[in-house]
């Protein structure tokens, strides 16, 4: 099994190398990761400037590693298209320092990187662990869970077209009661804008805080808040065609109104 590993925390993130340590027991691992932190970049792809790549010294001997001046999505696209010459069997992104739950997957660079594998028909995993004021203490718990999921994909126990989002408490596995398959929760957020002045110009900080979390026991948020590992199959949630219909008269009316508006210019 050939595994491309990326992340959004940067190529020297402890979470990435904890993951590599366990995944190399499953197959051949190649690292293609950003040369610096790229959190909350979502599905950003660099189109207006060249991507520069440097083969770099791995923190684990024997691992082929590349640092990319680009986003997590850039890394996976470039890795699959140019840097890895043999077919890749699995894309894994993480271990992210910070959970990716509910609607937050839409802005996650970790999930965005895994998405690039899935869009190219490669099973893909995003793995995250919570962060408070200190670094996570149990990165190996997340790495071991990911390695086991990778084995099951390899063996055919988990479908080959999977796009999985895994979140795990920062605990030893012996203290985690259960792993649950969960749907994504819907979270309510508010963005606040803080203003400052550097002596010459105004500047702004965007701050995001969660107003409410799901109390539904079936969702990923409830499960992680209650000490469970969560696995969510994102391909079923993000790409399912929503129910949305318009009558022919309504579609014609929209087009006619738009044409009328344009004629007035």
From Swiss-Prot:
Its main location: cytoplasm. One of its GO terms (molecular function) is metal ion binding. Keywords: Cytoplasm, Hydrolase, Metal-binding, Nucleotide-binding. A divalent metal cation binds at residues 8-9, 39, 96. Belongs to the SurE nucleotidase family. Its cofactor is a divalent metal cation. It comes from the Bacteria. It comes from Dehalococcoides mccartyi (strain CBDB1). It is found in: Cytoplasm. It is an enzyme of class 3 (hydrolase). Pfam families: SurE (PF01975). This is 5'-nucleotidase SurE. GO terms for cellular component: cytoplasm. The lineage of its organism: Bacteria, Bacillati, Chloroflexota, Dehalococcoidia, Dehalococcoidales. InterPro entries: SurE, SurE-like_Pase/nucleotidase, SurE-like_sf. It catalyses: a ribonucleoside 5'-phosphate + H2O = a ribonucleoside + phosphate. SUPFAM superfamilies: SurE-like (SSF64167). The gene is surE. Binds 1 divalent metal cation per subunit. Nucleotidase that shows phosphatase activity on nucleoside 5'-monophosphates. Its EC number is 3.1.3.5. The keyword DNA-binding does not apply.
